[in-house]
UniProtKB/Swiss-Prot annotation:
It holds the Pfam family CorA. It is a multi-pass membrane protein. This is Magnesium transport protein CorA. The lineage of its organism: Bacteria, Pseudomonadati, Pseudomonadota, Gammaproteobacteria, Pasteurellales. The gene is corA. A motif (Probable selectivity filter) lies at residues 276-278. Homopentamer. In the absence of Mg(2+), interactions between subunits are weakened, and dimers, trimers and tetramers can be observed in vitro. Disulfide bonds: none annotated. It catalyses: Mg(2+)(in) = Mg(2+)(out). InterPro entries: CorA_cytoplasmic_dom, CorA_MIT, CorA_TM1_TM2, Mg/Co-transport_prot_CorA, MgTranspt_CorA/ZnTranspt_ZntB. It is found in: Cell inner membrane.
């Protein structure tokens, strides 16, 4: 699918997808393009697109470079998969002849939000670099919202976990905690990747003054968000360690109970084993009260360590 946008009265407006209109486009957003759509861009604009396999490369030389096809940036965008788990999607940005090409394999919240804003928001410079930086700025705003949501969730989780009561809510809190840790790690990766992309853009291009200041402002926003995200990692680790501590304490209580029970019944078992041998020369076997005596001895053997443990405060 090709979404083409041109400038009209300093605003982005969507245009038709035929070749004539594509020549006037300043931004072409390609969402899972078909082979036919790739050929349209190649024949009409002379622009070849990266494959989705190339978007998975993580080395800097494969994500940020410039060649005869233009300036290329591959950047991560935060999203959620079909099961509402945190995920990252790679988007390819290419700027050539004053035109921005974006290639992605799924719908992304940052792109959807920017398209909505562009209906009423005017562009200052009306160039492809401004559109690129506006998309990055929208992405950072989304990441800031994600961090704020994690903060709010961790406040609720901390009340459940630090309460120490291991019930269904405690188990659910542990599951949510692991999800928040995964989300926070993806936010950190996205921030770092965006920082590298903007650094490359500032170094390798002659941005207009307004766009240069905009890029630096986004970099400052990233630097301000990174400590917040790092503190989230620390809080998640603290809550995880606290939860593991409570679980270990509960397990120790259970093991302590079984250890005491086994020690209590060990003397009684010894008595039962002794009289269970049934040798004829055991005088108690022919004693009228031998059986009650053995039972009483077993009870006394079990109660003696129990009373001793209670006095020692071990129970």
């Amino acid at each position: 699918m090709i979404n083409a946008f041109a400038i009209n009265d300093s605003r982005l407006v969507r245009i038709d997808e035929d070749q004539t209109d594509l020549n006037t486009a300043i931004w072409l957003d390609l969402l899972e393009p078909t082979g036919e759509e790739r050929e349209i861009l190649q024949e009409g604009l002379g622009q070849s697109l990266a494959s989705f396999l190339e978007l998975e490369d993580i080395e800097a030389s494969a994500r940020f470079f410039e060649d005869e096809d233009g300036l290329h940036l591959h950047s991560f965008f935060y999203c959620e998969d079909e099961d509402n788990y945190a995920d990252l999607a790679s988007v390819a940005f290419t700027i050539r002849d004053g035109r921005l090409f974006t290639l992605r394999d799924r719908e992304l919240p940052a792109f959807r939000l920017y398209r909505m804003r562009s209906r009423s928001q005017r562009l200052l410079e009306c160039n492809s670099y401004e559109v690129l930086l506006d998309l990055f700025e929208t992405k950072i705003e989304q990441l800031a919202d994600v961090i704020e949501n994690i903060y709010a969730d961790l406040e609720e989780l901390s009340r459940v976990i630090l309460n120490g009561k291991q019930d269904e809510a405690f188990d659910e809190a542990l599951n949510t905690l692991t999800e928040q840790e995964d989300t926070s790690s993806k936010v950190r990766l996205c921030l770092m990747d965006t920082q590298r992309a903007l650094g490359f853009l500032v170094r390798k291009t002659r941005l207009p003054t307004n766009q240069l200041e905009q890029a630096r402002e986004i970099l400052r926003d990233i630097e301000s968000l990174q400590p917040h995200n790092e503190s989230l990692f620390q809080k998640v680790n603290f809550l995880m360690q606290a939860a593991m501590g409570y679980i270990n304490i509960e397990q120790n209580k259970i093991m302590k109970f079984f250890s005491v029970v086994s020690v209590m019944f060990l003397p009684a078992t010894l008595v039962a084993s002794t009289y269970g041998m049934n040798f004829d020369f055991m005088p108690e076997l022919h004693f009228k009260y031998g059986y009650p005596m053995a039972i009483g001895l077993m009870i006394a053997a079990a109660l003696t360590p129990y009373i001793y443990f209670r006095r020692k405060g071990w129970l």
